[in-house]
Swiss-Prot record:
GO terms, biological process: neuropeptide signaling pathway
Keywords from the named record: Cleavage on pair of basic residues, Disulfide bond, Neuropeptide, Secreted, Signal
Residues making up the signal peptide according to the UniProt record: 1-28
Organism ancestry: Eukaryota, Metazoa, Ecdysozoa, Arthropoda, Hexapoda
Species: Camponotus floridanus (Florida carpenter ant)
Protein name as catalogued: IDLSRF-like peptide
Segments forming domain LDL-receptor class A: 45-85
Length: 201
């Protein structure tokens, strides 16, 4: 890489000298070979030591540069708040599978106990399991989640109270909304994963 850069720098110096000497020749100079090493890095598959490919410009960067506070991708995608939140949360596929298993085990309206009236009929009014799983993965806070799924304020406050009951170990409140003893473990497991990543902040 250093040799290629140095050769490129010499070539650029010669080209600029030629431009100064022959101003009309500026348009005829092809610098694509000078920039070729940059383009190949962006168009090839990423190396294991730089496995993240920026979606906008195709630049490969190290995982350590994701969500570090300094944009490395041209469009700043490596610092996108949704990406950084999703990096801390369980994968969307895992969340969707977990939601599906809750629905399969406890019935199509089970998640209404957590998310409110719009969660009836296997979450169809909220856009389905996949959309809810994505919103849980990308939403930094419960407020962001409510906005992403257009939850009513009452449903959002209900969800917040369920989270607080889980966090505080208030089994009485959870039972009062119809969560049975046999279901408590599943609900607690699911909600604690979100709480640990700042969902209630």
């Amino acid at each position: 890489m250093v040799r290629r850069f140095c050769n490129g720098a010499v070539a650029l110096g010669i080209a600029l000298t030629a431009c100064a000497a022959f101003p009309r020749a500026i348009m005829a100079i092809d610098l694509s070979r000078f920039y070729g090493h940059i383009n190949t890095k962006r168009s090839d598959a990423c190396h294991p030591y730089e496995p993240f490919k920026c979606p906008g410009d195709g630049l490969c960067i190290s995982i350590q540069y994701l969500c570090d506070g300094a944009p490395d991708c041209q469009d700043g995608y490596d610092e996108d708040s949704r990406l950084c939140t999703a990096a801390k949360r369980p994968p969307v596929e895992e969340t969707a599978t977990f939601l599906q298993s809750l629905l399969a085990s406890h019935g199509p309206n089970y998640l209404e106990k957590l998310f409110g009236n719009k969660a009836r009929d296997t979450l169809k009014p909220l856009g389905g399991v996949e959309k809810v799983a994505i919103a849980l993965s990308e939403s930094q806070t419960i407020e962001d989640f409510g906005a992403a799924l257009h939850l009513m304020r009452s449903d959002l406050e209900h969800l917040r109270s369920v989270f607080m009951a889980v966090e505080n170990g208030d089994l009485g409140m959870l039972k009062s909304i119809g969560i049975k003893d046999s279901e408590l473990g599943d609900v607690k497991f699911f909600l604690e994963k979100l709480v640990k990543t700042g969902f209630l902040d």
